[in-house]
């Protein structure tokens, strides 16, 4: 089986340790999926990336990299270059994650050329036919739904949204990672990790740190296109017990989760945060202001969701810091949850099974 995995734009930092380009969870997930496909004997995988340099890259032997187009190319130029690459490769399936106009056009293209298009939703907003960052309606979304062979969602909310609003069925496959044999949690500080975005509400973590001078806080917040980043950084620097970090290379970010006592999420909404996976795989309990996909924090007792209340978030932070038995219980459950639900090897096998079943049905 020949599979082409398309990495989202801004993925160059995953292939160059010196790059300061900011990327998100969708980039990491497609990188992990492509890497694991490369280890599967039954799959001939090609990883399609933008036309940029791939230097200082330790895992080159695990990828068959194919350069396609520049991010600055017009959409029809992208399509022409992409068309030529796909005609050379002749894949059985194409995987893509993260909603863009290109996604919808690609679904139509694959339908015309008899290629199974597998679309993976990156956030809850996408399942409602809206772009993740802007919230604007994706006008060509129905083209994607009508022509994609397989839709993969991250949680039951996304699956239900697609079914109720658009009559399309999907398959839940959660984010995956290469997991550890035992938890690494060391419990040194309270951690927040996300790019600068109004949806992530970073100012609330700064507020939390300022209210708790007895503990050390670390905030990894790379800049983005969102305004007022310098103002945020200056505000953070005024809080003595808060360390504000502008950038951490992809290969080093796991160390921050290993040493964290608690991970805090202040986002308005997300699909399944990549950071939840990074926290749980290290046995780090989670405090979330609002985000709780499939009620996993409460259902699996791996943290607390505070239903939008900063006061409750404060109370739960105090509780986790003062109750050693509760903390150890949640830490162990967090690690066990990741082992059962987020093994990239198991997830990739599920994707292969879906594509194989679809191919058999198609023929």
Model feature map: region roles:
Residues 1-51, 210, 363:
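N-terminal subdomain of nucleotide-sugar transferases
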Residues 230-248:
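Nucleotide-activated donor-binding/catalytic signature segment of Leloir-type glycosyltransferases, i.e.
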């Amino acid at each position: 089986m020949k599979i082409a995995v398309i990495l989202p734009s801004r993925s160059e930092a995953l292939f160059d340790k010196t790059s300061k380009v900011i990327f998100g969870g969708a980039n990491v997930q497609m990188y992990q999926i492509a890497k694991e496909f490369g280890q599967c004997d039954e799959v001939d995988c090609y990883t399609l990336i933008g036309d940029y340099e791939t230097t200082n890259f330790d895992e080159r032997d695990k990828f068959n990299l194919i350069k396609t187009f520049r991010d600055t190319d017009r959409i029809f130029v992208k399509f022409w270059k992409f068309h030529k690459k796909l005609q050379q490769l002749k894949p059985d399936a194409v995987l893509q994650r993260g909603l863009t106009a290109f996604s919808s056009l690609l679904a139509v293209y694959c339908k015309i050329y008899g290629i199974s298009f597998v679309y993976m939703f990156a956030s809850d907003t996408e399942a409602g036919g809206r772009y993740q960052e802007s919230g604007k309606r994706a006008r060509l979304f129905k083209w994607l739904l009508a022509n994609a062979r397989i839709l993969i969602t991250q949680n039951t909310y996304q699956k239900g949204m697609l079914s109720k609003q658009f009559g399309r069925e999907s398959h839940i496959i959660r984010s995956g990672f290469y997991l550890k044999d035992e938890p690494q949690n060391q419990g040194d500080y309270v951690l927040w990790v996300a790019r600068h975005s109004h949806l992530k509400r970073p100012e609330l973590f700064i507020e939390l740190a300022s209210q708790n001078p007895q503990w050390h806080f670390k905030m990894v917040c790379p800049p983005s296109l969102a305004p007022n980043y310098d103002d945020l950084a200056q505000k953070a620097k005024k809080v003595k017990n808060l360390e504000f970090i502008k950038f951490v290379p992809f290969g080093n970010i796991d160390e921050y989760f290993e040493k964290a006592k608690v991970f805090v999420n202040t986002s308005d909404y997300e699909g399944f945060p990549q950071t939840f996976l990074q926290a749980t795989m290290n046995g780090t309990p989670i405090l979330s202001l609002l985000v709780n996909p499939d009620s996993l924090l409460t259902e699996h007792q791996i943290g607390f969701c505070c239903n939008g209340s900063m006061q409750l978030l404060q109370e739960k932070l105090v509780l986790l810091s003062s109750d050693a038995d509760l903390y150890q219980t949640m830490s162990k459950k967090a690690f066990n949850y990741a082992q059962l639900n987020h093994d990239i090897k198991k997830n990739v096998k599920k994707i292969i099974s879906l594509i194989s079943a679809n191919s058999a049905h198609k023929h």
